[in-house]
């Protein structure tokens, strides 16, 4: 081995010992004829001192520059009092260097590694191999490794088997677009990269493996957001002969143990909340319980008002009128309210009504709002009492189709909570349960809210008679308003699976073409089974406090699903395309 210790491992117990370090020159300083090198490796920094007494080594140290790769041998010694650095793990010691070998030189990096805040993300991704040298980036990937190690250990200890499933599969309708891979040996046919190992893990349960897990790479060709990538990693889990409460218990214990082991954070038992309650109170199926603001329904008080913006949705069976009280925010300037009005417009809201509660004892005169003139005072008082409004509060209103109100006020609740620093705690884990089986599309057709293999809480006949009322045996783990993982009890009965397909408009021919292998497996003694998949990237993002999952993936794609470092995706030569039986169509030239 070239090194005896990592830089970050040096401490006072090594005082007087000889060590050999290998790494990069993080910083070079010349003070009063003495040269100081901060040497960096994966584990941290160490200060190495070179004095002129060793002329040859001193001359070498004088020639090194930032990011040179070096091997240094020297003796550990305690730093003098007053020269210790509490910000470094090895800040109480230094190494007196007496041998220095330059293993490789380096050009000046495109950006400084300790002053990176003004560097654009595209530049950082273009030189990701340099960006990852920054200690804060290395720390995130090291924590990611600890997280996966902890999870594997827990699942191994609880009887789960790590089984790999295929990357090349067949296209199936799972919601997002597939990444397609053309087949050379089957002209005109395509593999699909997996959006999840869903069907294969169910088949492993049919095969009798009982408890399965996999740290699985998954692919979805969809528009990217801050928490999405075209390729991402799932902690995929499936079990047989366990019900919802069993699976929830096993996976919750895993997450609680993970946070204790990695962050020394202890969680109480996670609360459970039905989907309907989450949407009603928080406007979201992944509520952030750290924010003490709730949506309150007030439609019953606004059905008879002449203000159509309120009375229309209040009398619409698919409409909703809800209020959101923000304590102590009546002094909010109009410019801020205008900004929030634009913000809710992103979610389809046509405006943002409000009432500032200045002095309730004065009745309407104590309220400041352009809408109070449209609402009878008795109804106003009921609304203000219902939301718990007191002097100094502001109450926002949303009135539209229920989905728009939930989306707009739910997002506003989060934004206001962060803007006004209303968060009451650092962590808020929970379970959301009792999801609907289906959601209605704009054209009136139905889509599976989770996926079409989720078991409903009813019989096949009841499902087909009233699919809109059917609840599923699904459950999502939510942390700080982010869905960490989603799962369900699966359908293990062929007739039930076919009933779900029929509700989704998948006829028998399409069932056989796309899911024949699954229906075939369900005929041969499929056990009751269920599972859950966690998004590893999101989990690491939350645990590290990163702003995006791109910060916790070694080599992520950009927002437009490209790789600026390798220039992927790239073009393919004509010979390769001919072997794949593919001919490219010329794109029309832009005028």
From Swiss-Prot:
Annotated GO biological processes are:
aspartyl-tRNA aminoacylation
Q: Which gene encodes it?
A: aspS
What is one Pfam family matched by this protein? GAD
What family classification does the UniProt entry report for this protein? Belongs to the class-II aminoacyl-tRNA synthetase family. Type 1 subfamily.
Q: What is its main location?
A: cytoplasm
Source lineage: Bacteria, Pseudomonadati, Pseudomonadota, Gammaproteobacteria, Pseudomonadales
Domain of life of the organism encoding this protein: Bacteria
- For the ligand (ATP), the binding residues are 220-222, 229, 483, 535-538
Q: What is the name of the protein in this document?
A: Aspartate--tRNA(Asp/Asn) ligase
PROSITE patterns hit by this protein: AA_TRNA_LIGASE_II
């Amino acid at each position: 081995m070239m090194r005896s210790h990592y830089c970050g491992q040096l401490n006072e117990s090594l005082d007087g010992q000889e060590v050999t370090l290998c790494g990069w020159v993080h910083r070079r300083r010349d003070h009063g004829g003495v040269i100081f090198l901060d040497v960096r490796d994966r584990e941290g920094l160490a200060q190495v001192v070179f004095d002129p007494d060793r002329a040859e080594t001193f001359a070498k140290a004088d020639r090194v520059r930032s990011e040179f790769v070096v091997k240094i041998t020297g003796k550990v010694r305690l730093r003098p009092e007053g020269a210790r650095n509490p910000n470094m793990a090895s800040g109480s010691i230094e190494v007196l260097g007496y041998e220095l070998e330059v293993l490789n030189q380096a050009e000046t990096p495109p950006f400084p590694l300790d002053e990176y805040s003004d560097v654009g993300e595209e530049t950082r991704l273009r030189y990701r191999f340099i960006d990852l040298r920054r200690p804060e980036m290395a720390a995130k990937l090291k924590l990611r490794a600890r997280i996966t190690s902890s999870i594997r250990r827990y699942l191994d200890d609880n009887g789960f088997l790590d089984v790999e499933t295929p990357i090349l599969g067949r296209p199936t309708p799972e919601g997002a677009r597939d990444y397609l891979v053309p087949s050379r040996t089957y002209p005109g046919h395509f593999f699909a990269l997996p959006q999840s190992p869903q069907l294969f893990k169910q088949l492993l349960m049919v095969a009798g493996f009982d408890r399965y897990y996999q740290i699985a790479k998954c692919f979805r060709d969809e528009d990217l957001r801050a928490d999405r990538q075209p390729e991402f990693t799932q902690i995929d889990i499936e079990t047989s002969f366990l019900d919802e409460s069993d699976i929830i218990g096993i996976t919750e214990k895993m997450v609680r143990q993970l946070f204790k082991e990695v962050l020394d954070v202890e969680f109480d038992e996670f609360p459970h909340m039905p989907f309907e309650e989450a949407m009603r109170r928080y406007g979201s199926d992944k509520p952030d319980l750290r924010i003490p603001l709730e949506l309150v329904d007030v439609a019953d008080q606004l059905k008879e008002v002449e203000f159509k913006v309120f009375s229309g949705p209040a009398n619409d069976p698919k409409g909703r009128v809800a209020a959101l009280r923000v304590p102590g925010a009546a002094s909010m300037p109009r410019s801020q309210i205008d900004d929030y009005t634009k913000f809710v417009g992103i979610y389809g809201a046509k405006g943002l009504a409000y009432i500032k509660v200045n002095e309730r004892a004065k009745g309407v005169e104590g309220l400041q709002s352009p809408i109070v003139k449209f609402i009878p005072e008795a109804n106003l008082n009921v609304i203000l009492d219902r939301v718990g409004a007191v002097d100094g509060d502001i109450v926002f209103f949303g009135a539209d189709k229920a989905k728009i109100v939930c989306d707009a006020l739910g997002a506003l609740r989060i934004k206001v909570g962060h803007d006004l620093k209303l968060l009451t705690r650092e962590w808020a884990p929970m379970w959301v349960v009792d999801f609907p089986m289906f959601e209605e599309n704009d054209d009136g057709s139905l889509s599976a809210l989770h996926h079409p293999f989720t078991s409903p809480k009813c019989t096949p006949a009841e499902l087909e008679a009233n699919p809109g009322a059917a609840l599923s045996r699904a459950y999502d783990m939510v942390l700080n308003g982010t869905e960490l993982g989603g799962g369900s009890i699966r359908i293990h009965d062929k007739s039930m699976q076919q009933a779900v397909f029929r509700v989704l408009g998948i006829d028998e021919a399409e069932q056989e073409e796309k899911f024949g292998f699954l229906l075939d497996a369900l005929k041969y003694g499929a056990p009751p089974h269920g599972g859950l998949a966690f998004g590893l990237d999101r989990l690491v993002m939350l645990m590290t406090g990163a702003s995006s999952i791109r910060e916790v993936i070694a080599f992520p794609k950009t927002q437009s699903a490209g790789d600026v470092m390798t220039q992927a995706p790239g073009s393919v030569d004509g010979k390769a395309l001919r072997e794949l039986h593919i001919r490219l169509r010329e794109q029309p030239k832009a005028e």
